[in-house]
Curated annotation (Swiss-Prot):
It comes from Xenopus tropicalis. Residues 1-26 are annotated as: Disordered. PROSITE patterns: LRR. The gene is lrrc40. This is Leucine-rich repeat-containing protein 40. Transmembrane segments: none annotated.
């Protein structure tokens, strides 16, 4: 019987003479070997607390295979190695870098981001070939002055550290193109940054800066400057000289006014939201010919200047959460504007349905109301005003007719539209007619002359008691405003207006909901508040699949039929000011979704 247990391993009789087994290296030898050939070594996310000496000495020490392979004809030519040019030590647990880093003078890229490094070694100055240095997401409080010797450095990433200042010597990095010091503790910036004339991208966001040095204006090649989330109260006038600037971020500061930027003709984006800016004048807008994005949200603007129309290239304008009570009509003339944000402003004088329809409908609305100095026609000059004809009645806005395709004769207190007004249109292709705020008792007969082109008619604030058949012949009409008249009914011939999308009938004398509206399936908006309507037919409203806004406020509705809750297309339903008991005011206050849900719950099953 063997003296060893079955299955057991016999002891090594030479074990006492063998050298102890070496601990497995933190960096596999295969990686080091491959790096000697490629010149690149990636040791990211390996849990390293120190960098192995073999990494620093990769191009100094003779590799182990040199002692094993003396065959000069072999394919593995260990003596033909490449200097290490790229070293990645990111996402480890490093706290310090050895001075032995000087043994890697050929490094072009050094990435040590996402560690716990508190300082850089003085030997960093030996890396004179370094072009990109990423030391972001560490715990560095101070940069060594030796950094100035990195004369080939193009990218320096220092974001998310604990820096309280930048050394004056940073100005010696003469060919630096990218500098990111965001998310640090900087309270000021050295004037020496003005020497970084090759800088293209400069990120100063999320610090504690109260001012920028005047010298920053010397950065003539800078394209992007980000100063978001600081404590800036003003911007130096020298910024206006940064003629290559394309993007300027000044969000979340304490600015009360904007600097004048007369020479920033290449500026494409200006972000100044979340400040305390109260005024915006023409001097801020002129010469910004390339601007495509202007962000002014969360400020205190009360007036938007008419000179906003100078920004012909503007594509996105964010004015949300300001104190704007009105908008300049010239805003409608911006040819490239695709997004206009206005939420949170106390806007008056613009219909809610227009605001709800989005940017393009709002711009169209504003464009149709551009006021241009009136020009008298020859017929007007030869006419003589009488006691029955107000002098203002002989004035025609010919500029609006020719350029805006708008025929406008409003606020004249006229009982008739002068023939000269219609004659002035000539062969122009009129799309908008505005005869509001007069004393008209009927729809002008000659309006039918524009039936092939007109799509928007405003006859609000008159004394019209009925809609003529002439108006029903405007088959291209998409919007009609008849508010504040004395209408009691609508003609059945309106059924032929198959392009009609919006109708405003508020403040008239309707006692019944006009049946003809049920038969116009294209309607999206019906505003018929402040009348005397006593009932509605939900079965007909359900068939109007495009109806999204229905305003029935201040009528005589004694009950709201539960079936109205099945109008799935409704996005805005206004019922306040009626004598019905249900839904209760508390439910109405919750909005359209809650009201429709309540009504559906009342449908008998």
């Amino acid at each position: 019987m063997s003296r060893f247990r079955r299955g057991g391993k016999a002891p090594d009789p030479l074990s006492g003479f063998r050298a102890p087994k070496e601990q497995e290296p933190a960096v596999p030898h295969g990686l080091i070997k491959a790096a000697r050939k490629s010149g690149q070594l990636n040791l990211s996310a390996r849990g390293l607390t120190d960098v192995p000496v073999s990494v620093w000495r990769i191009n100094v020490d003779t590799p182990p295979e040199a002692h094993q392979n003396v065959d000069f004809g072999g394919s593995d030519r260990w003596w033909e190695q490449t200097d290490l040019t790229k070293l990645i030590l990111a996402s480890n647990k490093l706290q310090l870098l050895s001075e032995d880093i000087s043994l890697l003078p050929a490094l072009v890229v050094l990435d040590i981001h996402d560690n716990q490094i508190v300082s850089l070694p003085c030997a960093i100055k030996e890396l004179t070939n370094l072009q990109k240095l990423n030391i972001s997401h560490n715990k560095i409080k101070q940069l060594p002055k030796e950094l100035q010797h990195l004369q080939n450095l193009k990218s320096l990433l220092l974001q998310h550290n604990q820096l309280e200042e930048l050394p004056d010597s940073i100005g010696h990095l003469s060919i630096l193109e990218e500098l990111d010091v965001s998310n640090n503790c900087l309270r000021s910036i050295s004037s020496s940054v003005g020497q970084l004339t090759g800088l293209v991208k400069f990120n100063l966001s999320s610090n504690k800066l109260t001012a920028l040095p005047t010298e920053i204006g010397k950065m003539k090649n800078l394209k992007q400057l980000d100063c978001t989330s600081n404590l800036l109260e003003n911007v130096p006038a020298s910024v206006a000289g940064m003629e290559s600037l394309e993007q300027l971020y000044l969000r979340q500061n304490k600015l009360t006014y904007l600097p004048e930027l007369p020479f920033l003709t290449k500026l494409k984006e200006l972000h100044v939201g979340n400040n305390q800016i109260q005024t915006l004048g023409p001097e801020h807008l002129q010469n910004l010919s390339s601007l495509s994005v202007l962000e002014l949200r969360y400020n205190k603007l009360k007036v938007l200047p008419e000179e906003i129309s100078l920004l012909n290239g503007l594509e996105r304008l964010d004015l949300s959460n300001n104190d704007l009570g009105s908008l300049p009509c010239t805003l409608g003339s911006l040819p490239n504007l695709k997004s206009l944000q206005l939420e949170g402003n106390p806007l008056r004088g613009i219909r809610r349905d227009i605001l709800n329809k989005g940017t393009q409908e709002l711009l169209k609305y504003l464009k149709g109301r551009v006021q241009v100095p009136d020009v008298k026609t020859q017929e007007d000059e030869n006419s003589t005003a009488t006691a029955m004809t107000l002098p203002s009645e002989s004035v025609v806005n010919t500029h609006a007719i020719v350029t805006l395709k708008t025929l406008e004769y409003c606020e004249k207190q006229a009982s008739l539209i002068p023939e000269a007004v219609f004659n002035a249109t000539g062969s122009s292709f009129i799309t908008t007619v505005n005869f509001s705020k007069n004393q008209l008792t009927e729809v002008p007969a000659r309006i039918v002359e524009m039936k092939d082109s007109v799509c928007d008619v405003n006859l609000g604030f008159n004394k019209i008691s009925s809609i003529s058949l002439n108006l029903c012949m405007l088959l291209k009409l998409t919007h009609i405003d008849m508010r504040n008249n004395v209408l009691t009914s609508l003609p059945s011939e309106m059924e032929a207006m198959t392009r009609l999308q919006s109708v405003i009938l508020s403040f008239n004398r309707f006692k019944h909901f006009p049946d003809v509206l049920y038969r116009i399936p294209t309607l999206e908006t019906i505003l018929i508040s402040s009348n005397q309507i006593g009932s509605i037919d939900p079965t007909q409203l359900i068939k109007m699949t495009k109806l999204s806004t229905l305003d029935l406020q201040n009528n005589d509705l004694l009950q709201i039929p539960p079936a109205l809750g099945n109008c799935e297309s409704l996005r805005a339903l206004h019922l306040e000011g009626n004598p019905f008991r249900n839904p209760r005011a508390a439910i109405l206050a919750k909005g359209t979704v809650a009201v429709l849900e309540y009504l559906r719950s009342r449908i008998p099953t």
